[in-house]
Amino acid sequence: MTETREPAETGGYASLEEDDEDLSPGPEHSSDSEYTLSEPDSEEEEDEEEEEEETTDDPEYDPGYKVKQRLGGGRGGPSRRAPRAAQPPAQPCQLCGRSPLGEAPPGTPPCRLCCPATAPQEAPAPEGRALGEEEEEPPRAGEGRPAGREEEEEEEEEGTYHCTECEDSFDNLGELHGHFMLHARGEV
């Protein structure tokens, strides 16, 4: 049957050698047993089996287990993460110290700095301006620009897209793309 060699002969490992004896399965393991490979009855069962294999959360059997854990579980399965905590309470206004409008005690006026939309119309000036300064109107067309600047802008509007390879100008992005593809093929 089988021989066990001494550890000195095999380098510390025991080996089994087969004799000429035919080792066929016993009567309890016939070739028609339930352990033989069988095809699933339908594609639906096959899909269900594949899903079960892919969604296992057992790290011993699932090589992608750690990735799934980082990403929040497998496909459509319930997440094992703890539910998110409620948002922390809103901080009081850094300028006046009052609670934000939604958390202010009833009857107290809202903070004009935190909630300018609900505060009375007497809102203070924004932080960027000092009191007494007026807002400047945006410059009107033709005002505040040097005369030579208009010509440069018109030139840029004609060819707003520039090739980075040869500095040619194009009216639209499609033309520039086509030109760039010519560079890529070596035709330009």
Curated annotation (Swiss-Prot):
UniProt entry keywords in alphabetical sequence: Metal-binding, Phosphoprotein, Zinc, Zinc-finger
Organism: Homo sapiens (Human)
Mapped zinc finger ranges (C2H2-type): 161-183
Name of the gene encoding the protein in the UniProt record: ZNF428
Protein name: Zinc finger protein 428
Biased composition (Basic and acidic residues): 138-149
PANTHER family xref list: ZINC FINGER PROTEIN 428
PROSITE patterns membership: ZINC_FINGER_C2H2_1 (PS00028), ZINC_FINGER_C2H2_2 (PS50157)
Keyword Phosphoprotein assigned: yes
Stretches that traverse the bilayer: none
